[in-house]
Amino acid sequence: MKANELREKSVEELNTELLGLLREQFNLRMQAASGQLQQTHMVKQVRHNIARVKTLLTQKAGA
């Protein structure tokens, strides 16, 4: 997800997005641990998206 798309979302929407990303990260880690993960690059992408959302939440909390 692009940072511009995330900036347009409200705090509630960002929290929902964060929960979804954390669930996805958990599922990817479980797949990696069991050897079923085909697209290993997804772990890094999800981690970066989580960081983007958390950064925006921090910025919106300060503003």
Swiss-Prot record:
Its family? Belongs to the universal ribosomal protein uL29 family.
PROSITE patterns, per database record: RIBOSOMAL_L29 (PS00579)
Tell me what organism the protein belongs to.
Pectobacterium atrosepticum (strain SCRI 1043 / ATCC BAA-672) (Erwinia carotovora subsp. atroseptica)
**Please, one GO biological process term?**
translation
GO MF annotation list: structural constituent of ribosome
UniProt KW keywords:
Ribonucleoprotein, Ribosomal protein
Query: Which is one Gene Ontology cellular component term of this protein?
Result: cytosolic large ribosomal subunit
Q: Which domain of life is it from?
A: Bacteria
Give the protein's recorded name.
Large ribosomal subunit protein uL29
